[in-house]
């Protein structure tokens, strides 16, 4: 259940019912107007707080991605890595504050002046462009995170599932006025099934070893789940930038980014797992010629029991 506020039309209906009952005292009228004003202010505050929470969670996810990709020794030796700015994390946390202020002065102030019709409703294509830009802005961080530590097959399967489900969400957003919410969710779930079957077909028809197939299938499936969940959240944000259930949506997205954080932590072991598999597949003659460094690396790597999710 989302935290929803009454629309301007609903407020007008309530306002008219109150005054059609015969009580037209100036005191009652002033009280109702004051209550509606405070409700609208509370709505604006909750919207800005939800947007700020969403942006902060994004910044935390990006910072966590950098801390997972790059070793701790590198971060300590170069305090401003990778931007060569000592206060890079603190500066990055100012981005959500600036974003929330921009949205408030650009989109919320007109609502205060024109409550009957929001200006963003008159330009749906422009708002669609803004939605796509907001989605694409988070993909480079994910791509950099995966590219710095993942094999090409894992990166490709993960990014493809993400892009396909985001495209599905964009199609649903365009057709939001022509079908019900249940039909939109059914469309997204149908795309999930198709992409999952295609992914299984690709993974199990390649000449790979079974451990590698299971590894790629596991990560691509988790990526598919994350991308599908994210596309559902995009569906919730049908009213672009300022959804009426923005508090619930921001909380869901925050949980999603936390899940992505642990997913990246899980993916980081991929190289160690593959190296362990290669060592196990070596013939006995090659195993006898292993150097002490190889043996120490094999003993310090992640055990094969971590393959199971």
Swiss-Prot record:
User: Topology versus the membrane, per the UniProt entry?
Assistant: Multi-pass membrane protein
Alphabetic keyword roster: Host cytoplasm, Host membrane, Membrane, Transmembrane, Transmembrane helix
The protein's predominant localisation is host cell
Q: Where are the transmembrane segments?
A: 50-70, 85-105, 128-148, 154-174, 185-205, 210-230, 245-265
Q: List the GO cellular component terms.
A: host cell cytoplasm; host cell membrane; membrane
Superkingdom of this protein's organism: Viruses
Protein name as catalogued: Protein US16
Give the family from UniProt. Answer: Belongs to the cytomegalovirus US12 family.
Localization in the cell: Host membrane; Host cytoplasm
């Amino acid at each position: 259940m989302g935290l929803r506020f009454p629309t301007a039309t609903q407020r007008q209906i309530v306002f008219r019912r109150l005054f059609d009952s015969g009580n037209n005292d100036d005191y009652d009228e002033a009280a109702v107007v004051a209550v509606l004003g405070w409700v609208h202010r509370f709505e604006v505050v909750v919207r800005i707080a939800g947007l700020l929470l969403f942006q902060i969670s994004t910044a935390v996810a990006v910072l966590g991605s950098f801390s997972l990709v790059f070793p701790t020794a590198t971060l300590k030796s170069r305090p401003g890595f990778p931007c060569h700015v000592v206060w890079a994390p603190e500066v990055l946390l100012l981005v959500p504050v600036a974003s929330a202020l921009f949205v408030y002065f650009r989109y919320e102030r007109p609502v205060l002046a024109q409550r009957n019709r929001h200006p963003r409703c008159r330009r749906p294509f422009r708002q669609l462009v803004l939605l796509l830009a907001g989605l694409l802005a988070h993909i480079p961080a994910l791509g950099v995170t995966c590219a710095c530590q993942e094999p090409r097959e894992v990166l490709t399967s993960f990014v493809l599932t993400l892009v396909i489900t985001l495209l599905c969400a964009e199609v649903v957003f365009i057709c939001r006025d022509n079908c019900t919410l249940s039909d939109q969710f059914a469309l997204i779930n149908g795309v999930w099934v198709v992409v999952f079957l295609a992914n299984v077909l690709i993974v199990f028809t390649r000449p790979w070893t079974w451990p590698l197939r299971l590894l790629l299938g596991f990560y691509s499936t988790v990526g598919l789940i994350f991308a599908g969940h994210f596309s559902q959240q995009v569906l919730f944000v049908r009213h672009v930038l300022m959804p009426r259930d923005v508090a619930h949506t921001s909380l869901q997205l925050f949980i999603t980014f936390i899940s992505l954080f642990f997913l990246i932590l899980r993916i980081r072991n991929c190289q160690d797992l593959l190296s362990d598999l290669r060592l196990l597949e070596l013939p006995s003659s090659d195993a006898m010629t292993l150097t002490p460094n190889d043996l120490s690396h094999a003993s310090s790597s992640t055990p094969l029991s971590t393959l199971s999710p």
